[in-house]
Design a protein with these regions (language model features):
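Regulatory and interdomain segments flanking nucleotide-handling catalytic cores
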Residues: 1-277
């Protein structure tokens, strides 16, 4: 029975292994996590930019950076997060799940969904504590809409290897997409689809200024070109036992992941990205 059982198990694992694919080791890897049907999820949120959603995405990015092995840089814009992973810091550095594509995609998407749900709930509690404690949100349709969306967001993920020289270019591509999305979002918040049809981003900016007095350049940086996340040294206070056995607070320096809500334009400052890879 034991041999038959082992034979059956080996046969089943053989079917699994046929579809098991791996990325190339020792070159940078990109994970891109995308919100599933976020055009529906974001319905009823503030336009053109919802700060609750943006902060939630930023905190989700930070969680992924902190918890995915080998991650060295994160970037988020709109409903997507791009992560840069390396496995060559030392001669013995290992890769996340051995760069098993199925594992990386499924786990990163699951992690993003979990982290987003937790971060989203935390933002609602922080900004609308009374509404979170009551089933009656009164006449505030916005808060009611946000609360109703709790636990409904989902993400998918894709992973791929990329030459080291192309990592910054990949992020430039995503940041340029962020800028285009940003301008179009402000446009859609102020003009009809018919009025915007066939208009370039420069034309939309001109329309916003001439007809509504809105200067797109005045929006916060993270609204215009996304946010980044990287690890850096930060000063913190921590408890320490002194010679007398008493606890005192001392200043320490530790490596922490931080969110940069004012990243530069990557095409103009490539070193901002390239120093991490």
């Amino acid at each position: 029975l034991s041999k038959k059982y082992d034979s059956l198990g080996d046969r089943m694992k053989g079917y699994e292994n046929i579809a098991r694919n791996y990325l190339t080791r020792r070159i940078p890897t990109i994970i891109r996590v995308d919100g599933k049907a976020f055009h529906t999820f974001t319905r009823g949120m503030e336009k053109p930019f919802d700060r609750i959603l943006m902060t939630t995405m930023q905190n989700t990015m930070k969680y992924l950076c902190e918890n995915i092995q080998g991650c060295v840089f994160g970037y988020t814009q709109s409903d997507e997060i791009t992560l840069v992973l390396t496995d060559y810091a030392t001669i013995t550095t290992d890769a996340w799940f051995g760069y098993n594509i199925q594992k990386m995609c499924s786990v990163s998407a699951s992690m993003a969904t979990l982290a987003f749900s937790n971060a989203y709930a935390a933002e609602l509690w922080k900004n609308f504590p009374e509404a979170m404690c009551s089933s009656d949100n009164g006449t505030n349709k916005y808060i009611e809409t946000l609360v109703a969306k709790m636990g409904t967001a989902m993400f998918d993920a894709r992973v791929f290897s990329i030459p080291k020289d192309e990592v910054c270019n990949c992020l430039i591509w995503r940041q340029q997409d962020a800028t285009r999305n940003s301008i179009e979002s402000v446009g859609h918040a102020n003009f009809s689809q018919k009025e915007l049809h066939g208009k370039s981003c420069n034309s939309i900016q001109d329309m916003l200024w001439k007809e509504h007095g809105i200067n797109w350049n005045d929006f916060p940086v993270d609204c215009k070109r996304g946010s980044a996340c990287y690890k850096t040294k930060v000063k913190e206070t921590a408890p320490l036992l002194n010679d007398k056995g008493d606890t005192e607070m001392v200043e320490v320096v530790r490596n922490r992941w931080v969110i940069d809500r004012e990243p530069p334009i990557f095409s103009q400052e490539r070193g901002y990205v390239e120093k991490w890879i």
